[in-house]
Design a protein with these regions (language model features):
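Residue-level detector of functional hotspots within protein domains
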Residues: 16, 21-23, 49-51, 70, ...
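Short N-terminal helix-initiation segments at or just after the protein's N-terminus
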Residues: 24-26, 53, 106-107
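Substrate-binding N-lobe of the ribokinase-like
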Residues: 28-92
Length: 167
């Protein structure tokens, strides 16, 4: 606890101001990048919603949440400034890549895996979607952030090529 207090005392307004780039006077939401978050399921709605909200808080101009209807309905109440892209579901999980190619091509970054799994495991069709998104990010050189079940999926793969800028 003492170390945390010392670090907190070292964080000043000037330090924080210098970390984040200055916003352009004539900038608009399109100026500051577009994050696409692909995740969420019937059981884990919050993870993808919080990741989407965090991307806006950290400075992204636009954020599209690509998920199943149940997740998008909840997200629209909590954060109406998000953009929404509905995906088909089977047994509460994402099962389709529906035009994700266009969304990913236009993205500045993709977040994949937050809450995307099922009640006990990741369904096969969801795994296919994850694999497809990773492949598209690699093809178009889009930075990829893997989280939660995205990492769980990755741990089961032997020969998967990740995009160069993957976290």
């Amino acid at each position: 606890q003492k170390a945390i207090l010392i670090i907190m005392e070292m964080v000043t307004k000037e330090l924080v101001k210098n970390i984040f780039p200055k916003r352009q006077v004539l900038g608009h939401k399109g100026t500051y990048g577009h994050v696409v978050v692909i995740g969420g399921s019937k059981w884990y709605r919050g993870a993808s919603i919080f990741a989407s909200m965090a991307s806006l808080k950290m400075g992204a101009g636009l954020c599209t949440l690509a998920s199943i209807e149940k997740v998008l309905q909840t997200a629209s109440l909590l954060c109406p400034e998000l953009l929404f892209f509905p995906l088909k579901e089977k047994k509460g999980c994402i099962v389709q890549k529906k035009s994700l190619k266009k969304k990913i091509q236009l993205a500045g970054a993709v977040v994949l895996g937050c809450g995307i799994g099922g009640e006990n495991s990741i369904p096969f069709l969801t795994k296919c979607c994850i694999k497809n998104v990773i492949s598209l990010c690699r093809k178009f050189s889009i930075p990829l952030i893997l989280d939660a079940d995205g990492l769980n999926f990755l741990s089961t793969q032997k020969n998967i090529q990740l995009p160069q800028k993957t976290v």
